[in-house]
Design a protein with these regions (language model features):
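Beta-strand-rich binding/interaction modules
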Residues: 13-42, 66-69
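TPR-adjacent "capping" and linker segments in tetratricopeptide-repeat scaffold/adaptor proteins
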Residues: 90-112, 176-180, 294-307
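Residue-level recognition of tetratricopeptide repeat
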Residues: 116-117, 151, 191, 225, ...
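Structural marker of alpha-solenoid helical repeat scaffolds
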Residues: 138, 172-178, 212, 246, ...
């Protein structure tokens, strides 16, 4: 929301500066020394109108003795800053070594964690799959390594290979009729079954994933998409209510709720959903399309075919293929882009777009 700076010169003059991401009035800047205020001013700032001032702190005062605090309009603390001098003689932290080769790592947990770390922090010289495969060479049923291998291949579209790993992961998790504490493998298998069109199995699997708090919102959103595409709007809304209860910032779920309410004729309820999304995400393309005039929406999208494709696919996944076609036809009428034509051909079943 805001940024601030404080610097002290050799002459004892202290410079303070503040700016904000939007126009703010009634903010208060305070600088204190040993808990006692030595400077205080009420200010107004805006991105194009930053605040800057200076005052005399006196000779011999060091910056580490001063604390700068920014208060909001109601007197609450927004930010506080006290300079810190670092001792350059302090030894540096331990250097990160290149990870050992998978076969040289003593235990499977460490081997798995090295692979997982390199999934998180990309290293072009390390292939995380090598580490997961080494774990599975030692223990073919390892749940965590099988899960990561399944996710890895799902993302790359190799659904059959991914499903094999995920089912192996789930097999050990669910032994003795156990409901797994970690539903990552179950959720990802549900995504694969949905993508393959095996809807009954996808529904069953995704419902199992809703038992886990982490995956409840995501799994319920996927279920809502399935029901929405089937025209089962009441069932979809039931899933969406739970998805939003578990994650109030699941804007995909809130947008889908808005689309379904609109389809059911509840335009007021739909508008409230899109307004809620835009309050936190003012550049959300789906909510803007449902809110702006066609001309204003085109200006926002800037004739970018990939942005139109992403939005159209989102509508398609939400069960609103007619909207997806309308979006793609709109950009196709102004920009010649092969991938747009490919998707139009797929969605409409018309070969003319391939010519």
């Amino acid at each position: 929301d805001a940024a601030m700076n404080m610097e002290i010169g050799e002459d004892g003059k202290v410079m303070v500066a503040v700016n904000a991401t939007s126009r703010r009035q009634g903010l208060r800047v305070e600088v204190s020394r040993a808990g006692a205020p030595v400077y205080s001013k009420t200010i107004s700032v805006a991105p194009d109108s930053p605040f800057r001032d200076s005052f005399d702190a006196g000779k011999g005062v060091e910056d580490v003795e001063l604390t700068m605090t920014l208060y909001n309009e109601k007197g609450g603390v927004m930010y506080t800053y006290t300079p810190v001098h670092h001792d350059t003689s302090t030894p540096l932290p331990e250097i990160v070594d290149r990870p050992k080769r998978p076969k040289d790592i003593a235990n499977t947990e460490e081997c798995y964690l090295v692979g997982l770390r390199n999934l998180q922090f990309y290293n072009p010289f390390v292939n995380p799959v090598d580490y997961f495969e080494e774990v599975l060479r030692r223990d073919p049923g390892d749940t965590r390594a099988n899960t990561q291998m399944g996710v890895y291949y799902r993302i790359r579209g190799d659904y059959e290979k991914a499903a094999g790993y995920l089912r192996t992961a789930i097999r050990r998790q669910t032994k003795d009729y156990t409901r797994p504490k970690d539903a990552e493998a179950i959720y990802n298998l549900g995504l694969i079954l949905k993508a393959q069109g095996n809807i009954p199995a996808a529904i069953d699997t995704l419902f199992r994933a809703t038992w886990n708090y982490t995956y409840n919102s995501g799994a319920n959103t996927q279920l809502a998409q399935i029901y929405s595409e089937a025209g089962m709007y009441d069932e979809a809304l039931e899933r969406l209510e739970e998805a939003i209860d578990y994650n109030g910032r699941n804007y995909q779920a809130i947008n889908l709720k808005g689309l379904i309410l609109k389809a059911k004729g509840d335009r007021k309820g739909a508008a409230e959903c899109f307004s809620e999304v835009l309050e936190d995400d003012p550049v959300n393309a789906l909510a803007l399309r449902e809110t702006l005039s066609p001309a204003d929406f085109r200006e926002f999208m800037r004739e970018a075919p990939e942005s139109y494709l992403e939005l159209a696919i989102l509508y398609r996944n939400n069960g609103f293929s007619d909207d997806a076609v309308e979006i793609l036809k709109d950009i196709d009428s102004r920009v010649d882009y092969p991938t747009v034509k490919m998707w139009l051909g797929y969605l409409t079943g018309s070969y003319k777009y391939y010519e």
